[in-house]
Amino acid sequence: MATITSDPVVRPVPQILAHEVIAPRKTKRWVDWVLTTDHKKIGIMYLVLTGVFFCMGGVEALMMRTQLSVPNNTLLTSEHYNQLLTMHGTTMIFLFVVPVWAGFGNYFLPLMIGARDMAFPRLNALSFWMLAFGGIVFYATLFWHPPDAGWWSYPPLSESLYSPSGGQDAWIFLIHLTGISSLLGAINFYVTIVNMRAPGMSWNRLPLFIWSLLVYAILLIIALPVVAAAVTMLLADRHFGTHFFDPTDHGSPVLWQHLFWFFGHPEVYIMILPGFGVVSEVIPVFSRKPIFGYKAIAAATAVIAFLATLVWAHHLFASPLPIVVLSFFMLSSFLIGVPTGVKIFNWIATLWRGSLVMTTALWFTIGFIAIFIIGGITGIFLAVFPVDWQLNDTYFVVAHFHYVLMGGAVFTVFAGLYYWYPKITGRLLNERLGKASFWVMFFGFNATFFVQHALGLSGMPRRIYTYQPGLGWSTYNLISTIGSYILGVGVLLTIINIYRSLTKGQIAGPDPWKGNTLEWFTPSPPPVNNFDEVPRVRSVEPMRDIRRQVERQTGVIQKGGGSEQFARSS
């Protein structure tokens, strides 16, 4: 069994770092940020921008849940509800989850592999500003007519006959801009990882978070050209007289579904795999054990990426596909659960008999595992196409989608935030407030989405803006709405925590958690050039090796410090 440490004693330990200790630096002029090519500043701007979009998407979700809290509610019209639904889904997927990992990757990829910057710094800056510009244009549609065809924009609903406003064109413009931004970033990530690793950092010594970013980049390079072609064809249908998706003139709406979901299902793992990488970094640090099955986890990441390109048609089970095709995609959907299960069992094995230090980051990773397992189980139900025929377009699908994506992405984003915030800012977040945020979010999330399985089983369809009383949906919808507000309070606690810690947080030092990877070899926050001298990497845990070397040289055994410092941060 694991040993749990909840209130450890702070003990001073020798600090190991590449530079002299420096106090957190004040932010420079805004012009320096606008023109910067420093990967760390670009990473921070990604995180701030995506955090803003996350909050906006959350407000949109609360408005929709409020509308559905009681039958025959008149808070929103059907038109406004469809617009909010489209804005919420598009924001969370294209403006939050995918680019937030670009933010973490931009900041930590060079630090973790011993590089001084990304391979293409100017391209890096261009990627960020394309994302920002696309988001601004998309949200500018609030002032005339937002898109209302859903974040997937299925034709013929998204064709000019049914969506004549410029809002739908703004959606297409956003997909192009964010797609180009992500594609350029993915190329940058790939080249940096392949060519700029520290001496001795072979592929079997690469941090697991970097493995996940490598696969994230490869999937983006594979999937994004497909959706770019699809939205270009849709734009041509709307403005240039083509009929790719127009069923009245030999077009096929199902073609859009194939193109969109060939991108869309790899996109699910694009959003989740970096979160898996965060979990693989956080658990061994706070378990005080090496990761169990390093090679198996790295291999499982690659296998998931391969299988992710073979399961897209399970989103089309309700369309007219031959039984043999349905059977193939059902089996491939089952199969993709195997490498995911390998990861989960390896994480649990790492926790088992570890000396657990129950920080907020570790709580968020444990919460992720619990939530993601539930999402995976419901996914098995939906992978059986006769079952999917019954549950298709019901709230059961909504519940599954959020358990997988919010559990797999949002909870791991928060885990990464609490884990790496001291390195970014030089200050610790308040652990008491952080744990309160976790428990409120965890309870609110399950209250919001678990009951939606029951809504789906009782027949409530997706994408309806109101419903009649007496259908058995009212109580579940009210519970779900209350849960969504509780979830929002949990997020707000973390926002307050971040704001307070920027000025009042305890100084973190270079290695507050006693980490395993090279980013902890630098001061907090790191200097412009990251490293004066990059150490030779001799294992998958280079910082542990460096600490052992210092212990041998100084004769001082580090029996504490690191993560124990969090006890004073509250």
Where are the regions that the model predicts?
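Membrane-embedded and interfacial regions of multi-pass energy-transducing membrane proteins
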Residues: 2-570
